[in-house]
Curated annotation (Swiss-Prot):
Record bears the keyword Coiled coil: yes
Lineage: Eukaryota, Metazoa, Ecdysozoa, Nematoda, Chromadorea
Origin species: Caenorhabditis briggsae
Gene: pro-1
Protein name: Pre-rRNA-processing protein pro-1
WD repeats: 136-175, 287-326
Bias-annotated ranges (Basic residues): 451-464
Family as reported in the entry's similarity comment: Belongs to the WD repeat IPI3/WDR18 family.
Length: 532
């Protein structure tokens, strides 16, 4: 282990902003470690006793909080999940249809994407359900990458193709539809060895292959915007957050640097001699003597970490091209990535936010399980939870094909609505009655015509008073007997209404029982929280 140009005494007591996760494909203990990239001191390590002597495959953190990590076993269909916190002994494992060749998860840690041979799997970790399985390529998948906003997932395979899929289509509830990639690139003629994706809403895809070619793809333009050809097969790649520098590794241990800001507007095809140490256009870093398996750049683009097939890894300062740290593991470097400083690494007090369900299904299901997560912000409004319970019951009744409480209420109130419509029609008819006598003096009338008009006026007044009295009586009856429903259509209609009322009563009783169970459950949870 060597340190060059770093005064470790000045930074020994400070907390780093980011760490470096390193894993090697070895069955030996502590083959997965987390180090401080400034000093090279290990802050966390995984002994690997749960692997039972199997070689470590890939290591992937679940989400950005670093509460759990996923560890695959090399050449075995076993996947383990363990807690990072030293006091949390959580460990689960599951058996999958085959060995996992690539894995990634979203920022929340609720979704996991894994590739097994030619197929891409998507699991919901809050329930363990397998949401989708698609045949993504003609040959085995080699790499997976998820976009920064978790909206797109990209796959690369041995057939030389790169495909992009929308996450919303992979997690959709419609399991019968076929998911097709929204982007397809066939820019390589041999196997794709590495795949990296940039940050932002319009990311770019960087790939390298065994055909000596590195390609930079644009999603918005749906084309290859840069192609670099090397004199050696390319095995790994990396691009910084600002998209200004590209690093590509070869099978002989050379690392070539491409400064994108120095290229001209028409320079789309580059020729790189990675073995030439005196190359003035493309700087070559020489610190390895074996195949470069992993390359990664930190967040601010100042440090580059590289690992090779012999287990050697280096940390470089990009601006000066100086190697700050050199160390070795016991086997091939299989995982190398910069991560934020997780609170779980320090071993202090930590409250877990999420616990994955690692009973991963092997066949796609249709939402057979229900996941309820306990919120840290407790809402004490009882009416809010009553509404939530009622909405949940209505949704379950609707999905099962039964009649919901809202539909029953609508059916029960149908006679009252019908009566209200009749009354409204009568009121409109009464408003259209023409009252005579108000305009008696407008025109002279004589003889029998005048006497007849007086009689008509009296009849109209009596009719209007009678209608007003009937309307008042009807309103009074409706107010006094609002709970009573009377229908004159026959005994069958009355029986139907009584049945609906009985169903409403049963639903109200079940709702009260659920409210009582909910109250007891929250009292129990509150008591448990207070006791802790």
């Amino acid at each position: 282990m060597a340190y060059l140009g770093v005064d470790t005494s000045r930074i020994a007591g400070t907390q780093p902003l980011e760490m470096l996760l390193i894993s090697s494909s070895s069955p030996d203990p502590h083959s997965t470690i987390i180090i401080d990239p400034r000093t090279g001191v290990s802050s966390w390590s995984y002994k690997g006793g749960e692997l039972q002597g199997a070689s470590t495959g890939l290591v992937e953190p679940l989400g950005k909080d670093g509460e759990h990590i996923v560890v695959t076993t090399k050449d075995r269909p076993l996947v383990h999940v363990i807690a990072v916190h030293s006091k949390d002994r959580f460990h689960q494992k599951c058996v999958l249809p085959g060995p996992v060749s690539a894995i990634c998860s979203d920022r929340s840690g609720r979704f996991a994407f894994m590739s097994i041979k030619r197929q891409l799997y998507c699991w919901l970790l809050s329930t363990g359900e397998l949401l989708s399985v698609i045949d993504a390529h003609y040959q085995n998948i080699t790499k997976l990458a998820l976009s920064d906003d978790d909206s797109m997932v990209f796959t690369a395979s041995k057939d030389g193709a790169i495909h992009g899929y929308l996450v919303t289509e992979l997690v959709s509830a419609d399991r019968d539809s076929t998911v097709a990639p929204f982007r397809k690139w066939a820019s390589h003629t041999l196997a794709v060895s590495d795949l990296k994706i940039t940050h932002g809403s319009n990311p770019r895809i960087l790939t390298t292959g065994a055909d000596h070619i590195a390609c930079l793809h644009s999603i918005s333009m749906d084309s290859v915007i840069l192609k670099a050809s090397a004199d050696r097969p390319l095995t790994s790649c990396a691009i910084d957050s600002a998209e200004t520098r590209i690093f590509i590794g070869t099978e002989v241990g050379n690392i070539a640097q491409i400064n994108l800001f120095q290229l001209g507007a028409e320079e789309r095809d580059l020729l790189i001699q990675a073995g030439d140490e005196h190359n003035t256009k493309f700087r070559v870093l020489n610190g390895h003597s074996d195949e470069i398996t992993r390359l990664t750049i930190n967040t601010d683009g100042t440090l580059l970490a590289s690992g090779d097939a012999s287990g050697k890894y280096c940390i470089w300062e990009i601006s000066s091209h100086q190697c700050l740290k050199v160390s070795t593991m016991r086997s091939t470097i299989s995982t190398l990535r910069f991560i934020p400083f997780w609170p779980t690494i320090s071993g202090g007090e930590h409250t877990k936010k999420f616990r994955p369900v690692w009973d991963l299904r092997r066949e796609p299901t249709k939402c057979e399980r229900l996941a309820i997560e306990v919120s840290n912000e407790f809402n004490a409004d009882q009416k809010h939870w009553n509404d939530v319970i009622e909405d949940s019951i209505d949704q379950m009744l609707l999905e099962s094909g039964s009649t919901t409480s809202a539909q029953l209420q609508w059916q029960v109130e149908a006679p009252m609505r019908k009566q209200a419509e009749v009354e409204k029609a009568e009121a409109e008819a009464m408003a259209q009655v023409i009252t005579l006598g108000d305009d008696e003096d407008d025109a002279p009338e004589v003889g029998n015509q005048r006497r007849q008009n007086k009689k008509n006026n009296k009849k109209n007044r009596k009719l209007q008073k009678k209608l007003e009295a009937e309307q008042a009586l009807k309103n009074k009856v409706i107010e006094e007997e609002a709970e009573l429903i009377v229908i004159d259509d026959g005994e069958e209609s009355n029986k139907k209404i009584l049945d609906l009322q009985a169903s409403m009563t049963e639903l109200r009783e079940e709702n009260e029982k659920l409210k009582e169970i909910n109250r007891q459950m929250y009292e129990f949870v509150a008591a448990e929280i207070v006791d802790r």
